[in-house]
From Swiss-Prot:
UniProt-listed CDD domains: KOW_RPL26
ATP-binding is among the record's keywords: no
InterPro entries assigned to the protein according to its UniProt record, in alphabetical order: KOW (IPR005824), Rib_uL2_dom2 (IPR014722), Ribosomal_uL24 (IPR003256), Ribosomal_uL24_CS (IPR005825), Ribosomal_uL24_KOW (IPR041988), Translation_prot_SH3-like_sf (IPR008991)
The protein's name: Large ribosomal subunit protein uL24
Record PROSITE patterns: RIBOSOMAL_L24
GO molecular function, one term: structural constituent of ribosome
Species this chain originates from: Rickettsia massiliae (strain Mtu5)
SMART domains reported for this sequence: KOW (SM00739)
Keyword Ribosomal protein: yes
Transmembrane feature ranges: none
Family to which this protein belongs: Belongs to the universal ribosomal protein uL24 family.
Keywords, ordered alphabetically: Ribonucleoprotein, Ribosomal protein, RNA-binding, rRNA-binding
């Protein structure tokens, strides 16, 4: 298992595949599979049976996307960027956009 540079709540864009160019927020991360679920991307319709807990019908849900197919959105420019780790003066480790040097995520606040 590799260390992922993505976290729940990050803004990302799809860079390859049939959903190329779509932007969204990460809803869930699967580190063991190196996949993420992005809101509004890779939607499928699933037919469900009714049971005691819920009605049957057709529901729309997101399927996971491999992390190699997404890129972070630079908070300063809004363009796709790579991510690096950097240590601040107080010793805390933060994720930084390589293009602009802007801190990504809540760690900088």
């Amino acid at each position: 298992m590799i260390k992922l540079k993505v976290k729940k709540g990050d803004e990302v864009v799809v860079i390859t595949g049939k959903h190329k160019g779509k932007k969204g927020k990460i809803l869930k991360v699967f580190p063991e599979d190196s996949k993420v679920i992005v809101f509004g991307v890779n939607l499928v319709k699933k037919h469900t049976k009714s049971n005691q807990m819920s009605e049957g019908g057709i529901i729309t849900k997101e399927l996971p996307i491999h992390i190699s197919n997404i890129a972070h959105i630079d908070p300063k420019t809004g363009n796709p960027t790579k991510v690096a780790f950097k240590f601040l003066e107080d010793g805390s480790k933060v994720r930084v956009a390589k293009k602009s040097g802007e801190i990504i995520g809540k760690e900088g606040k």
